[in-house]
Amino acid sequence: QQLLDTQFVEAADDIAMHYAVDQDQDVLAAAEQLMGDSWFGRHAYYMAQRHSAANNPTYLYFYERRPASNDETIGASHALELNPLFGGFIPFWPTDARDDELSEQMQLYWRNFAATGDPNGAGLPTWTAFDELNAQELALGHERSYSRPVVRADRYEAMTNQLLRREQALQPVSSD
C-alpha cells in the first residue's frame, strides 16, 4: 500500500483494484507485478501508443519465459529477454530446447524488423502490429510465442491516466 500511495497518490485506490490480494502469499506477487508494470510495462505501452499514433510500424512484446531454475522467485524479470535475444544464457542456469527455440525466434524477429520494418517471416508465429484500436503484444512464453491482446492494458491505462492528470496539472495556465 505504501508503494501505491507514494507512486500514485490520488489514484492509488484505482490502481490497487488491478492488483487484488486474497491471501498473504499473494502480496509479494502483486507487489512484483505492480513494480514491473509501473517501472517498465506502462512506459512501453505508452510509447507504443504514441509511436503507432504517428503511423509508425509498432510491435510490442511481453516476455514470459522464466528461467528453468528451482531457485528463481520473481519470474521473467526486467532485461531477462536480453539473454536469448543475443544468443547467450546465464551461466549455470539450466536451459532446454524451448530456450534455444525462443532465442532463434527472437533473433529472427529482430533481424526481420531491422531489414524490412516488419518482424514477421517464414516459419515464425505471426506478430500482430500494435495500434491504438487493436493493442496487441507478442507473448514470448514457455510453450510457444503468439500474438494476443495486451493482457495488462487496463493496468497500463489506469497508470497512464494518472500520469497524464499529473502532467496536465503542471501545465502553465494561459493568460488569455
Can you say where each PLM-predicted feature lies in the sequence?
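Acidic/polar loop patches that form or flank catalytic/metal-binding clefts of enzymes
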Residues: 55-62, 116-126
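Mature extracytoplasmic/periplasmic domains
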Residues: 120-148
